[in-house]
């Protein structure tokens, strides 16, 4: 009997893993004692993330669940054939019903079926504020509460003040005040409305008068000094009355911000602007026009450069000139003046550091180098005569160690026989040393020449071998 592979209880491909976590504070069931305080949270599929990371290494960046690695496997890898379960179909179904039935089967096979109660999962709807934040005390001013209650909670309410003590019949008085206080007041209001018939402006800061409302106005905010140097009302003054501590705090705040008034703050630092502007921009043309207009205003005319004259003398001179012009009038043809070119520009009025006008010169052409056809040496480069002064100076700077030491020394006239023998012997030894060095140099040059010839022979043989191959 053949061995059959036992079907596993859990299909790892379609299986879903969960984490057991605490229920969220925003969950409405967090305050329910019957509901479990721990819920199941589906885990993120790590294998999918690993597969996507491996796909990125191969250059596949598609963000879907398809396995592209199956097309990148080796062709020599063995494949395993898994038989699919047989699905029974009812032949009596209609074609349309048959297609719907096939879609339902495919969806049922592909999707994992989870049959767990909803209480083990988190609620779909969550509240905006958590359970612990709801129970937390509220800090800050309460605009929706009565100022007396806020003052009492902050321990700023003066219980010893006789005005703050309630009388025995305060409920009856309060009901009389809220009831309207009689029909005479109503008649007065109706009469004023009928007589005026126009819109009236009411001051919101002044409040209601004692004649109109009686004892309704006990604690009005208009009695308190709530204005600051920034706003008409402060945040705390809109909720509670100002006591000594709050007034002192406001005074310190105003005193501190006096340092930032317009009179106290100095001029701001100039901003360093960087950028590029086109030479033909309209903004640059406007600036240049303004500059010329300002220069025309500042410059003086030739008439203004001389000594000041009395106005009477100036008027007489002008009258004489007008009379002469009226008497002698000749017609002359005035030609327009020729346009004059000048090297001075608007930049030269500031500085001549970069503006240096001069004639444009044609640079001399470089002399053509001629080469000798025999030697290949450029002509007119080497000296034609003897040594120049620089060459003589260079020869004189030669190191003395390169010249003969004994032979170059002058012979003394007063030398004796022993000194002459010693001098001749030194010259002989020096010449012998020079002959030895000369012989060694010749031998070294000869060996180097032979070695280079051998290298050339080997190189030619290698080149010929490469050509033949």
Curated annotation (Swiss-Prot):
Keywords noted in UniProt: Coiled coil, Ribosome biogenesis
UniProt-listed InterPro entries: Ltv1 (IPR007307)
Ranges of compositional bias, category Acidic residues: 183-213, 315-328
UniProt feature, compositional bias: Basic and acidic residues: 88-106, 394-403, 411-433, 445-454
GO annotation terms (biological process): cartilage morphogenesis; definitive hemopoiesis; digestive system development; ribosomal small subunit biogenesis; ribosomal small subunit export from nucleus; ribosome biogenesis; rRNA processing
Stretches of the chain forming a coiled coil according to its record: 444-467
Region (Disordered) residue spans: 88-112, 175-219, 298-329, 394-454
Keyword Heme annotated: no
Any one Pfam family match given in the protein's UniProt record, by short name: LTV
GO cellular component, one term: preribosome, small subunit precursor
Gene deletion effect: Knockout disrupts ribosome biogenesis and embryos display aberrant cartilage structure, defects in digestive organs, characterized by smaller size of liver, intestine and exocrine pancreas, and impaired definitive hematopoiesis.
Superkingdom of the organism of origin: Eukaryota
Recorded family membership: Belongs to the LTV1 family.
Function as written in the Swiss-Prot or TrEMBL entry: Essential for ribosome biogenesis. Involved in organogenesis of digestive system and definitive hematopoiesis.
Name recorded for this polypeptide: Protein LTV1 homolog
Gene (UniProt): ltv1
